[in-house]
């Protein structure tokens, strides 16, 4: 098991990068219709959510202000689940809220674990990385 531990932080950073970019893509599509081509007017709360997704997604992806951005993103997904999906039932598979739940918990994990060693936060010495706290 110890032989695999050396890969844990690099793969955590890769996961953080991919999740952040995917989240930012959701926001870009919501605001600008980047991928689906939709450009309809959004209610103000959805517009705010789209901007949170773009900003927090890129911050998490590149590991800048990681804990703050991940906490905000996790909270946004909790709000999205309870405002949009939960009225249709509390089971995520039934109410189509699986992605909101997964994002909520992944971002909360990133908030708890921190940026990792492959991040701008680690490069500028902001906060302690998970590798530094486990050694």
Show the residue positions of the predicted features.
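Extended, low-polarity transmembrane helix blocks
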Residues: 1-32, 38, 46-51, 55, ...
């Amino acid at each position: 098991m110890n032989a695999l531990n050396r890969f844990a932080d690099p793969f955590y950073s890769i996961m953080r990068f991919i999740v952040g970019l995917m989240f930012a893509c959701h926001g870009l599509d919501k605001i600008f219709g980047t991928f689906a081509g939709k450009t309809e007017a959004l209610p103000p709360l959805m517009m705010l959510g789209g901007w949170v997704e773009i900003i927090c997604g890129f911050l998490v992806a590149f590991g800048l202000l990681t804990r703050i951005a991940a906490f905000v993103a996790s909270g946004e997904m909790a709000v999205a689940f309870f405002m949009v999906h939960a009225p249709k039932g509390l089971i995520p598979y039934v109410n189509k809220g699986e992605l909101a739940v997964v994002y909520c918990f992944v971002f909360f994990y990133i908030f708890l674990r921190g940026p990792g060693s492959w991040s701008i936060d680690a490069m500028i010495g902001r906060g302690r990385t998970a590798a530094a706290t486990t050694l």
